[in-house]
């Protein structure tokens, strides 16, 4: 049986990829997508919006118009996502969240919602990136206490948050594995005379340029050698296909707060 999916914020770069991925997925039935009431794409065909030709499904301006969906996929903004979370919880709908930049308090709100609804919070829905998280856990356990750890990320000029949600998640995975508090050991950029490096810190470096889809590298550096774990995305369709996989998995999930590690069966 196909899963009925609605795309929230479907007129953006990611939203258009999600439309195409959902329309072409054998196990997904695309039932609609939302845009803001002020959007120039109100009552617009989703297929035309995504550049794949008309598919006979028009954009909506409210979630209530998409109530036939089983699972909603949200790559909008922090404020909009939290509003959509409330609606989905009240209407017993599952939600895949790809929006990034949430504060710790906002993540707690999403986690709390997971007590009464099924929700996935995934700063990156790429299968490769989530395998990388697992590799980081293994690497940190083996050599994390003996190396200097730095995280580098690069994205397109239009990305609004920095460092990326994926980079923060990388740091969180490493810090948790090593028993460190990321809020205390994270260093976001360096300038001037910084002195010798504190061995327990985890550094973050950010690039915003051109049309870079997404690049992430974790460095585990010692004197004489270093290990680099890198993921590079060349197409947003990678994230869209991962989101479809998450939506299909979520349809049978009990109420809970999940991530892509659950979807891929990578949890210990």
UniProtKB/Swiss-Prot annotation:
<dbReference type="InterPro" id="IPR022663">
    <property type="entry name" value="DapB_C"/>
</dbReference>
<keyword id="KW-0521">NADP</keyword>
<feature type="binding site">
    <location>
        <begin position="9"/>
        <end position="14"/>
    </location>
    <ligand>
        <name>NAD(+)</name>
    </ligand>
</feature>
<keyword id="KW-0457">Lysine biosynthesis</keyword>
<dbReference type="GO" id="GO:0008839">
    <property type="term" value="F:4-hydroxy-tetrahydrodipicolinate reductase"/>
</dbReference>
<dbReference type="InterPro" id="IPR022664">
    <property type="entry name" value="DapB_N_CS"/>
</dbReference>
<dbReference type="GO" id="GO:0016726">
    <property type="term" value="F:oxidoreductase activity, acting on CH or CH2 groups, NAD or NADP as acceptor"/>
</dbReference>
<feature type="active site" description="Proton donor">
    <location>
        <position position="159"/>
    </location>
</feature>
<dbReference type="GO" id="GO:0019877">
    <property type="term" value="P:diaminopimelate biosynthetic process"/>
</dbReference>
<feature type="binding site">
    <location>
        <position position="156"/>
    </location>
    <ligand>
        <name>(S)-2,3,4,5-tetrahydrodipicolinate</name>
    </ligand>
</feature>
<keyword id="KW-0220">Diaminopimelate biosynthesis</keyword>
<feature type="binding site">
    <location>
        <begin position="122"/>
        <end position="125"/>
    </location>
    <ligand>
        <name>NAD(+)</name>
    </ligand>
</feature>
<dbReference type="GO" id="GO:0009089">
    <property type="term" value="P:lysine biosynthetic process via diaminopimelate"/>
</dbReference>
<keyword id="KW-0028">Amino-acid biosynthesis</keyword>
<feature type="binding site">
    <location>
        <position position="36"/>
    </location>
    <ligand>
        <name>NADP(+)</name>
    </ligand>
</feature>
<dbReference type="InterPro" id="IPR000846">
    <property type="entry name" value="DapB_N"/>
</dbReference>
<protein>
    <recommendedName>
        <fullName>4-hydroxy-tetrahydrodipicolinate reductase</fullName>
        <ecNumber>1.17.1.8</ecNumber>
    </recommendedName>
</protein>
<feature type="binding site">
    <location>
        <begin position="165"/>
        <end position="166"/>
    </location>
    <ligand>
        <name>(S)-2,3,4,5-tetrahydrodipicolinate</name>
    </ligand>
</feature>
<keyword id="KW-0520">NAD</keyword>
<comment type="similarity">
    <text>Belongs to the DapB family.</text>
</comment>
<dbReference type="InterPro" id="IPR023940">
    <property type="entry name" value="DHDPR_bac"/>
</dbReference>
<feature type="binding site">
    <location>
        <begin position="98"/>
        <end position="100"/>
    </location>
    <ligand>
        <name>NAD(+)</name>
    </ligand>
</feature>
<dbReference type="Pfam" id="PF05173">
    <property type="entry name" value="DapB_C"/>
</dbReference>
<dbReference type="GO" id="GO:0005829">
    <property type="term" value="C:cytosol"/>
</dbReference>
<dbReference type="Pfam" id="PF01113">
    <property type="entry name" value="DapB_N"/>
</dbReference>
<keyword id="KW-0560">Oxidoreductase</keyword>
<dbReference type="GO" id="GO:0051287">
    <property type="term" value="F:NAD binding"/>
</dbReference>
<feature type="active site" description="Proton donor/acceptor">
    <location>
        <position position="155"/>
    </location>
</feature>
<dbReference type="InterPro" id="IPR036291">
    <property type="entry name" value="NAD(P)-bd_dom_sf"/>
</dbReference>
<dbReference type="GO" id="GO:0050661">
    <property type="term" value="F:NADP binding"/>
</dbReference>
<keyword id="KW-0963">Cytoplasm</keyword>
<comment type="function">
    <text>Catalyzes the conversion of 4-hydroxy-tetrahydrodipicolinate (HTPA) to tetrahydrodipicolinate.</text>
</comment>
<comment type="pathway">
    <text>Amino-acid biosynthesis; L-lysine biosynthesis via DAP pathway; (S)-tetrahydrodipicolinate from L-aspartate: step 4/4.</text>
</comment>
């Amino acid at each position: 049986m196909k899963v009925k999916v609605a795309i929230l914020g479907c007129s953006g770069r990611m939203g258009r990829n999600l439309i195409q991925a959902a329309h072409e997925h054998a196990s997904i039935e695309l039932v609609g997508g939302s845009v803001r009431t002020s959007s120039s794409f109100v009552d617009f065909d989703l297929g035309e919006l995504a550049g794949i030709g008309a598919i006979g499904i028009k954009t909506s301006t409210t979630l209530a118009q998409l109530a036939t969906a089983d699972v909603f996929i949200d790559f909008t903004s922090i404020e909009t996502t939290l509003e959509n979370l409330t609606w989905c919880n009240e209407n017993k709908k599952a939600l895949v969240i790809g929006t990034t930049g949430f504060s710790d308090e906002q993540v707690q709100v999403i986690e709390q919602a997971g007590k009464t609804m099924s929700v996935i919070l995934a700063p990156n829905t790429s299968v490769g990136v989530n395998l990388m998280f697992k590799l980081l856990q293994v690497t940190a356990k083996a050599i994390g206490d003996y190396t200097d750890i730095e995280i580098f990320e690069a994205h397109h000029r239009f990305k609004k948050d920095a460092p990326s949600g994926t980079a923060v998640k990388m740091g969180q995975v490493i810090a948790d594995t090593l028993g460190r508090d990321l809020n205390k050991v994270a260093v976001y950029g360096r300038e001037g005379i910084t002195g010798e490096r504190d061995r327990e810190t985890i550094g973050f470096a950010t690039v915003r340029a051109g049309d870079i889809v997404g690049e992430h590298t974790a460095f585990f550096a010692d004197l004489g050698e270093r290990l680099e774990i890198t993921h590079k995305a060349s197409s947003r369709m990678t994230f869209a296909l991962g989101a479809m996989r998450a939506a299909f998995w979520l349809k049978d999930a009990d109420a809970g707060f999940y991530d892509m590690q659950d979807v891929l069966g990578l949890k210990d």
